[in-house]
């Protein structure tokens, strides 16, 4: 089973690919897709999808796992995040991947044992749980690894 974990965002989206071989988890790759707020939204969404499409074609995941989002007090921010999620879900559908969504507290609890963990705690734990992740310093990238990890260890596939 290969899972593409996605921490959805418009400005700094984290992605990660983690595989489960027998009972072992194996980190394959991860990264961050950054877009500029100066660019028009449709160009930003297209860029995000073009990078994620390359990841899908290279690693051939069976499933995508994405963080559920909450409604922000800033409605414009929430709407833009909704655009990003919709574009990502459309790409996931185009490649006929199964998809799971996880609440932020579920991800935090699965990775750290505490549902209200801070970003640095998640980063620390993924480095302990998955060999190969030591070079990760970006919290969006770490969150994407945590999302893929959560999908695999909760057997939510």
From Swiss-Prot:
Entry keyword Transcription: no
* Locations listed in the record: Cytoplasm
Q: Name one GO cellular component term.
A: Holliday junction resolvase complex
Tell me the keywords, alphabetical order.
Cytoplasm, DNA damage, DNA recombination, DNA repair, DNA-binding, Endonuclease, Hydrolase, Magnesium, Metal-binding, Nuclease
Essential cofactor(s): Mg(2+)
Q: What is its EC number?
A: 3.1.21.10
Can you tell me which residues bind Mg(2+) 1? 7, 140
Q: Which CDD domains does the UniProt record give?
A: RuvC
- Report the Pfam families cross-referenced here: RuvC
Q: Name one GO biological process term.
A: DNA repair
Which reaction is the catalytic activity of this chain? Endonucleolytic cleavage at a junction such as a reciprocal single-stranded crossover between two homologous DNA duplexes (Holliday junction)
Q: Which GO terms describe its molecular function?
A: crossover junction DNA endonuclease activity; DNA binding; magnesium ion binding
Q: What class of enzyme is it?
A: hydrolase
Write out the residues that bind Mg(2+) 2: 67
Q: What is its main location?
A: cytoplasm
Cofactor remark from the record: Binds 2 Mg(2+) ion per subunit.
InterPro entries under this entry? Answer: RNaseH-like_sf, RNaseH_sf, X-over_junc_endoDNase_Mg_BS, X-over_junc_endoDNase_RuvC
Q: Please list the residues that make up the active site.
A: 7, 67, 140
Q: Which family does it belong to?
A: Belongs to the RuvC family.
Self-association or partners: how does it assemble? Homodimer which binds Holliday junction (HJ) DNA. The HJ becomes 2-fold symmetrical on binding to RuvC with unstacked arms; it has a different conformation from HJ DNA in complex with RuvA. In the full resolvosome a probable DNA-RuvA(4)-RuvB(12)-RuvC(2) complex forms which resolves the HJ.
Q: What does this protein do?
A: The RuvA-RuvB-RuvC complex processes Holliday junction (HJ) DNA during genetic recombination and DNA repair. Endonuclease that resolves HJ intermediates. Cleaves cruciform DNA by making single-stranded nicks across the HJ at symmetrical positions within the homologous arms, yielding a 5'-phosphate and a 3'-hydroxyl group; requires a central core of homology in the junction. The consensus cleavage sequence is 5'-(A/T)TT(C/G)-3'. Cleavage occurs on the 3'-side of the TT dinucleotide at the point of strand exchange.
Output this protein's name: Crossover junction endodeoxyribonuclease RuvC
- Originating species: Rickettsia bellii (strain RML369-C)
**Designated gene of the protein:** ruvC
């Amino acid at each position: 089973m290969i899972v593409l974990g996605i921490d959805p965002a418009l400005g700094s989206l984290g992605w990660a690919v983690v595989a489960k071989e027998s009972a072992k988890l194996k980190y394959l790759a991860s990264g961050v897709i950054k877009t500029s707020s100066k660019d028009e939204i449709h160009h930003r969404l297209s860029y995000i999808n073009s990078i994620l499409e390359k990841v899908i074609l290279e690693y051939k995941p069976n499933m995508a796992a994405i963080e559920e989002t909450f409604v922000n007090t800033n409605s414009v921010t929430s709407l833009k995040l909704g655009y990003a999620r919709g574009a990502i879900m459309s790409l996931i559908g185009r490649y006929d991947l199964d998809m799971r969504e996880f609440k932020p507290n579920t991800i935090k609890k699965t990775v750290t044992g505490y549902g209200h963990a801070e970003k640095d705690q998640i980063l620390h734990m993924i480095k302990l749980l998955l060999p190969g992740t030591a070079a990760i310093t970006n919290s969006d990238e770490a969150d994407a690894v945590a999302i893929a990890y959560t999908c695999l260890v909760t057997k939510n596939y």
